[in-house]
Amino acid sequence: MSLPRNVIPMPRSRFLRVKCIDCGNEQIVFSHPATRVRCLVCGATLVEPTGGKGIVKAKILEVLE
């Protein structure tokens, strides 16, 4: 009997590099936030929590691993 390849499962959450639609500021955010994530420059909402995966209201530039 062989062992399964994924003995330890990888998390489904990621960090995202997003760009604010209002001011163009680039910021790194978590994909599953517990609180509302706001832009550090203008204060616009970038990600809203939903109890799981957040609703991203900014442009996703890159998924970081």
Swiss-Prot record:
Q: Assembly and interactions?
A: Part of the 30S ribosomal subunit.
For the ligand (Zn(2+)), the binding residues are: C20, C23, C39, C42
- The identity of this protein, by name, is Small ribosomal subunit protein eS27
HAMAP family, alphabetized: Ribosomal_eS27
The cofactor note from the UniProt entry for this protein is: Binds 1 zinc ion per subunit.
Q: Gene name, please? A: rps27e
GO BP of this protein: translation
**The entry's keywords:** Metal-binding, Ribonucleoprotein, Ribosomal protein, Zinc, Zinc-finger
For this chain, the family text in UniProt reads:
Belongs to the eukaryotic ribosomal protein eS27 family.
Q: Where is the signal peptide?
A: none
Matching entries from Pfam families are given as: Ribosomal_S27e (PF01667)
Which source organism? Pyrococcus horikoshii (strain ATCC 700860 / DSM 12428 / JCM 9974 / NBRC 100139 / OT-3)
List the GO terms this entry assigns under cellular component, sorted alphabetically: ribonucleoprotein complex; ribosome
Q: Which GO terms describe its molecular function?
A: structural constituent of ribosome; zinc ion binding
Needed co-factor(s): Zn(2+)
